[in-house]
Amino acid sequence: MINLLQFQILTEKSINSLESNKYTFKVDKRLNKTQIKEIFEQLFNIKVLNVNTCRSPKSFSRASKRYKSFYKKVILTVESGKLIQFV
C-alpha cells in the first residue's frame, strides 16, 4: 500500500493550499478516488472530505528524444484542525 503513494508535491501553490487543509500528492496512476480516500484514511487516521485528481499529459523530451510518461496528482481536503503527520 505504501508503494501506491509516491511523494508529496511541494510547490508554491500547494504550500499555500495547506492553509485551507489541502494536501497534494503524486500517486500511482491505477488508483481511483475511492481507493485513494481509503488508503489515506487508514494510513494517517484522518477523515478525507474531498478527493480531486488530475493526470499530467505525456510530454516529449528533446534531450532524450522520447516521451516522458504521465503521472497522477491528487489534492486531498481534510477536516479542519487535522494534520497529516509524516514520520
From Swiss-Prot:
It comes from the Eukaryota. It is found in: Plastid, Chloroplast. Its main location: plastid. The keyword Coiled coil does not apply. Keywords: Chloroplast, Plastid, Ribonucleoprotein, Ribosomal protein, RNA-binding, rRNA-binding. GO terms for biological process: translation. GO terms for molecular function: rRNA binding; structural constituent of ribosome. GO terms for cellular component: chloroplast; ribonucleoprotein complex; ribosome. Binds to 23S rRNA. Belongs to the universal ribosomal protein uL23 family. HAMAP family: Ribosomal_uL23_B. Part of the 50S ribosomal subunit. This is Large ribosomal subunit protein uL23c. It comes from Bigelowiella natans. The gene is rpl23.
